[in-house]
Curated annotation (Swiss-Prot):
Belongs to the bacterial ribosomal protein bL31 family. Type B subfamily. One of its GO terms (cellular component) is ribosome. Keywords: Ribonucleoprotein, Ribosomal protein. This is Large ribosomal subunit protein bL31B. Part of the 50S ribosomal subunit. InterPro entries: Ribosomal_bL28/bL31-like_sf (IPR034704), Ribosomal_bL31 (IPR002150), Ribosomal_bL31_B (IPR027493), Ribosomal_bL31_sf (IPR042105). PANTHER family: 50S RIBOSOMAL PROTEIN L31, CHLOROPLASTIC, LARGE RIBOSOMAL SUBUNIT PROTEIN BL31C. GO terms for molecular function: structural constituent of ribosome. GO terms for biological process: translation.
């Protein structure tokens, strides 16, 4: 490998799916301030909104996943308007 080409902070990080609570360990260069104990070790923690364990494409369930409240925000702005 060439020196100075690859990131120095490539390390194991725990990713936590906030929609269902599942966690998995993977290597990443992401900068985080939170840590968590996972399988007896302490790792940096990155919270994500959706992962393969909760995404409708991978689970086969067709449900509306709206963690950011985008539908509610749209309906509050434009849902009550009627054409006259």
């Amino acid at each position: 490998m060439k020196k100075g080409l690859h990131p120095e902070s490539y390390r194991p990080v725990v990713f936590k799916d906030m929609s269902n609570g599942d966690m998995f360990l993977s290597k990443s260069t992401v900068a985080t301030k939170e840590t968590i104990e996972f399988e007896g070790e302490t790792y940096p923690l990155l919270k994500i909104e959706i992962s393969n364990t909760s995404h409708p494409f991978y689970t086969g369930k067709s449900t509306l996943v709206d963690t950011a409240g985008r539908v509610d925000k749209f309906m509050s702005r434009y849902g009550d308007r009627k054409k006259k």
